[in-house]
């Protein structure tokens, strides 16, 4: 099987649909000899901030000298990013070889796996072969019925910020979303929650009490942000009498220091089981890279790409715009999935927007850009719709002055097209 054949095989699974339950994942992993049982995990669920949190945790473990695995979704640029070893995506050769190996077992199953279940099995086999010391494992959707939830008790279960998202699958209340995420909490385990919502916190506390798990909630009162610029933040944070001073996180966005506080709270728990020095923590955070999170793609005009795609995520983007650009109104390029309730997101954005360029992300679930443009117009914002992302970006650049700010947001699925379009425009890259 070649690399292209492997991708064709993986993506060809989609027609089998999205089906609830862990039975298929368990079956294929059993056929593979249960590679996950030879690994240790930090399991990460939540609505927003999962990717950045996973990236920071992986970087810290790697700086501490551990061989790391990282499992994430969705990928941003290339599929191989879904599973990484020591900070590098799986090679084309390894992906082809392991996919062919796993496919021989998948084809024997009467109830065939979904795409995500197949990829999870490929990832587990990859991490086993690489003999990872620790795998940072991000859920795909929810928690309880997510195919990553076939692992035993993880070294820590980490739950990032909770908000209403994926209403069809997770329900339309904070309690229903939190209940799904709480599925990664296992008997006797350590659990760390970001702590942004008291309703969610109560759900997690109840689940922890029921199964004998220990819950820690991030203390943002102990977070002192000294500096926050478009180039990142510097802050102090105290957790369990450990003071982390002058921590530099190179990821822009005012929300990243809070994500980092979640990571530091988790690391303090993990120090009981792993040899992680304060130097490794500081160096790991300082080295982290994560595209599409309030990322500056261009300086004149300033062009920012952000993956915010639900009210909490958009609020984080809006807060960052206010912090970095004060009273300046921005030009927005936005594309979303059709199943999103965009009204709360637009209500947050509208006071900051002077013009909107709506586009269609490269995904069959994408919302018609004209429908999104009309929703902007209903709020008094001039908006133009484009089916082609490159044309939308080009028109925004054409309308922008050198001191303007353009922000592309609404879906991670359009990041690659946005970045490519910006590169094609000969703007002054930083």
Each language-model region and where it sits:
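Short functional linear segments
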Residues: 1-46, 53, 59-66, 71, ...
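Beta-strand->loop->alpha-helix junctions that form or flank phosphate-binding loops
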Residues: 194-195, 207-229, 249-254, 281-287, ...
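Short, high-confidence coil segments that cap the C-terminus of an alpha-helix
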Residues: 111, 131-133, 327, 401-404
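C-terminal helical cap/extension that packs against the catalytic core
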Residues: 197-207, 211-216, 231, 302-305, ...
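ATP-dependent carboxylate-amine ligase catalytic core
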Residues: 22, 26-37, 63-152, 170, ...
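Acidic, Mg2+-coordinating active-site environments of NTP-dependent enzymes
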Residues: 110, 118, 131-138, 154-155, ...
């Amino acid at each position: 099987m070649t690399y292209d054949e492997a991708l064709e095989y993986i993506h060809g699974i989609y027609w089998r649909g999205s089906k609830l339950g862990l039975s298929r994942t368990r079956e294929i992993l059993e056929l593979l000899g249960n590679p996950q049982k030879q690994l240790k995990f930090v399991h990460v669920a939540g609505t927003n901030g999962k990717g950045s949190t996973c990236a920071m945790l992986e970087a810290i473990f790697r700086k501490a000298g551990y061989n790391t695995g990282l499992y994430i979704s969705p990928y941003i640029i290339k599929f191989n990013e879904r599973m990484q070893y020591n900070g590098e995506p799986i090679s084309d050769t390894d992906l082809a070889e392991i996919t062919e190996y796993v496919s021989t077992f998948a084809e024997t199953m009467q109830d065939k796996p979904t795409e995500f279940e197949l990829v999870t099995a490929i990832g587990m086999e990859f991490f086993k072969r690489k003999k990872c010391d620790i795998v940072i494992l991000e859920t795909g959707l929810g928690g309880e019925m997510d195919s990553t939830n076939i692992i035993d008790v993880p070294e820590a279960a980490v739950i990032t910020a909770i908000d209403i998202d994926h209403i069809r699958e997770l329900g339309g209340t904070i309690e229903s979303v939190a209940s799904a995420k709480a599925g990664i909490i296992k008997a006797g385990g350590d659990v760390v929650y970001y702590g942004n919502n008291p309703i969610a916190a109560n759900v997690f506390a109840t689940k922890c009490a029921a199964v004998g798990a220990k819950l820690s909630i991030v203390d943002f009162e102990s977070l002192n942000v000294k500096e926050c610029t478009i180039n990142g933040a510097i802050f102090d944070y105290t957790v369990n009498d450990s003071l982390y001073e002058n921590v530099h996180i190179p990821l822009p966005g005012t929300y990243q220091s809070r994500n980092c506080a979640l990571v530091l709270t988790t690391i303090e728990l993990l120090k009981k089981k792993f040899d992680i020095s304060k130097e490794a923590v500081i160096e790991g955070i300082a080295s982290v890279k994560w595209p599409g999170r309030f990322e500056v793609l261009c300086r004149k005009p300033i062009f920012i790409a952000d993956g915010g795609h639900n009210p909490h995520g958009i609020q984080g983007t809006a807060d960052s715009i206010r912090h970095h650009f004060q009273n300046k109104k921005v030009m927005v390029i936005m594309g979303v999935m059709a199943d999103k309730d965009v009204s709360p997101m637009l209500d947050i954005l509208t006071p900051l927007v002077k013009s909107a360029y709506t586009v269609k992300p490269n995904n069959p679930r994408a919302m018609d850009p004209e429908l999104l443009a009309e929703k902007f117009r209903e709020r008094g914002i001039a908006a133009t719709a484009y089916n082609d992302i490159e044309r939308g970006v080009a028109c925004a650049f054409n309308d922008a002055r050198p001191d303007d700010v353009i922000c592309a947001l609404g879906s991670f699925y359009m990041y690659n097209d946005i970045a490519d379009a910006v590169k094609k425009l000969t703007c002054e890259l930083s």
